């Protein structure tokens, strides 16, 4: 997706937030230079994992999440002009009074800032879409779930990150990278960084 940075309705895909946390240059290469590398093997594995988990979740109760009566919404596409975000939420659990985001990961890391900010972004989207609070989310694999609370501190970090991404897209300047050598080796844009 190439973004028109002069578009007043510009919104960024939520998955860019996690990418930005991994390395801001990914956003630069992907969105401003429109470089589309081949998908690494783990991306295809993740897509298969999502399909498998969705089929399993359709048959499960809500007890894993401490809920009883609820409605499931899978792969919900949402856009918010207010937050300048859009994305496809893996799964939303809707009760009479609240909504809960469930984000699938093959290797969920509840301590990863990228994972936390991504799920917080989805929480903002579903909260606006359903007009119900979303203060609790779940980062889950096929075996384990981690509860992530949506705090004011997390939302403030998210808003700053969105602002930083939009500023980079607006300026067109290649951002600095704080990625470690270990992160760089995993990156599909590694060959494009001439200072790494």
From Swiss-Prot:
Disulfide bonds: none annotated. This is CRISPR-associated exonuclease Cas4. CRISPR (clustered regularly interspaced short palindromic repeat) is an adaptive immune system that provides protection against mobile genetic elements (viruses, transposable elements and conjugative plasmids). CRISPR clusters contain sequences complementary to antecedent mobile elements and target invading nucleic acids. CRISPR clusters are transcribed and processed into CRISPR RNA (crRNA). This may be a 5' to 3' ssDNA exonuclease. The keyword Secreted does not apply. One of its GO terms (biological process) is defense response to virus. Its EC number is 3.1.12.1. Disruption phenotype: No effect on expression of bacterial lipoprotein FTN_1103. Bacteria are as virulent in mice as wild-type bacteria. It catalyses: exonucleolytic cleavage in the 5'- to 3'-direction to yield nucleoside 3'-phosphates. [4Fe-4S] cluster binds at residues 23, 184, 187, 193. Its cofactor is Mg(2+); [4Fe-4S] cluster. The keyword Ribonucleoprotein does not apply. Mn(2+) binds at residues 50, 90, 103. Part of a type II CRISPR-Cas system. Induction: In culture expression is high during early log phase (1 hour), decreases and then rises again in late stationary phase (16 hours). During infection of mouse bone marrow-derived macrophages (BMDM) expression is maximal after 2 hours, when the bacteria is expected to be in the phagosome.
């Amino acid at each position: 997706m190439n973004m028109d940075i002069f578009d007043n309705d510009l919104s960024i895909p939520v998955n860019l937030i996690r990418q930005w946390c991994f390395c801001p240059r990914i956003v630069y290469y992907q969105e401003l230079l429109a470089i589309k590398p081949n998908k690494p093997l783990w991306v295809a594995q993740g897509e298969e994992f999502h399909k498998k988990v969705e089929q399993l979740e359709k048959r499960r109760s809500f007890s894993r999440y401490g809920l009883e009566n609820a409605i499931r919404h899978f792969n919900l596409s949402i856009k918010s002009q207010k937050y300048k975000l859009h994305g496809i939420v893996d799964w939303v659990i809707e009760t009479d009074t609240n909504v809960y985001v469930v984000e699938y990961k093959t290797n969920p890391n509840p301590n990863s800032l990228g994972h936390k900010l991504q799920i917080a972004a989805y929480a903002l989207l579903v909260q606006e879409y359903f007009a119900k609070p979303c203060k609790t989310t779940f980062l889950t694999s096929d075996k384990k779930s981690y509860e992530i609370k949506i705090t004011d501190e997390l939302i403030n970090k998210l808003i700053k990150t969105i602002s930083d991404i939009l500023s980079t897209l607006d300026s067109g300047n290649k951002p600095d990278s704080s990625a470690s050598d270990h992160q760089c080796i995993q990156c599909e844009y590694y060959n494009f960084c001439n200072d790494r």
